[in-house]
Amino acid sequence: TGYLRDTAVTATAMDLDDQTAGNYVAKWEASFNFDHKQVMTLLDQINYLGAHNATTAGEIAQSVNSAASMGQIAGVDPAATAAMATAMQATGVATDRVGTSISRIYTNLSKGSNATKAQKEMWEELGFTAEGIAKSMQTDGVGTLKEVFTALQDMPDERKVAALSTLFGQWAIEGGAKITNNLGAYEKALAMVSDPSLYTGSMEREFIIQASTSESIDTMVKNSVTALKQDIGT
């Protein structure tokens, strides 16, 4: 079936085990309220990011699996979450901390009137209000993120750590600092997921290169069937 082949393509292109690939293909529809085609587009975007940055598609997918649902609530689509994960991983943030960092950033940007007194004061120091940022995230999440990180980048160096700590919390300081100091890497990754001419067919191309024999395709499809059966409990 299409699902089985798509799982095989995903596993091969991203160098994932079949069960992990099957989980992404099957479960991201419910997680992100996507149809199957949207899931495969997101996986193409992630695969392209992994091929063109100092990280891997598998690591990016792991962070997306962890943080993208929170991103959607905060006003950021999963592809943009993938771009942020890419920028953090490519600048040295450990993969197992990236998802948490991104989730904390999204949560803190969305607090609005629930922000702490210290956060409200820090937002004002940056030229924003906590309520304004929360509203802005809902209308243009990516634009708001870029605006916030640019403002942080423009702060005097001696204020940056305090600002990152106050606004994002200790668990997200490193990730926030990496984006602030490497805004170009984040913008480059965003540009990649915004251009269908770059990422469309990314996994299929990789799959064709690796699965050049009918024997290897048969093996991959059999493995995918096994993984899917385990996943749905048959």
List each language-model region with its residue ranges.
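Short coil/turn linkers that connect adjacent helices within long alpha-helical scaffolds
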Residues: 53-54, 71-74
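Alpha-helical architecture feature
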Residues: 2-52, 59-66, 77-234
